[in-house]
């Protein structure tokens, strides 16, 4: 069971890491995949910086948790994902943004998975 959890967490980590790298390598492509336009000016800087750092952080911290088998590495990426889902929901409720159920489901499922898997993968604290 532990190795299955490590493999799944590793796949999630790799996915987020690759997505984060795409924000530097091909920002137009990853923006399109996420259903958003590539912004211009200061917006472009914020979009690449914020989105890239989000995905890189989730990916790298998850992979460090998988490789070191240390549970605390899974908590920050989980929090980032769950708060992103919360803010997506609030943006829809408060400001009329589209409710992107598919993204919210991914963020909640992966975020909760990391909370579940962390202690089961860990060999140390």
Residue ranges and their predicted role:
Residues 1-15:
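Cytosolic juxtamembrane helix and N-cap/initiation of the first transmembrane helix
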Residues 86-102:
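Membrane-helix boundary connector in multi-pass membrane proteins
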Residues 101-113:
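Small-residue-rich transmembrane alpha-helices that serve as helix-helix interface/gating elements
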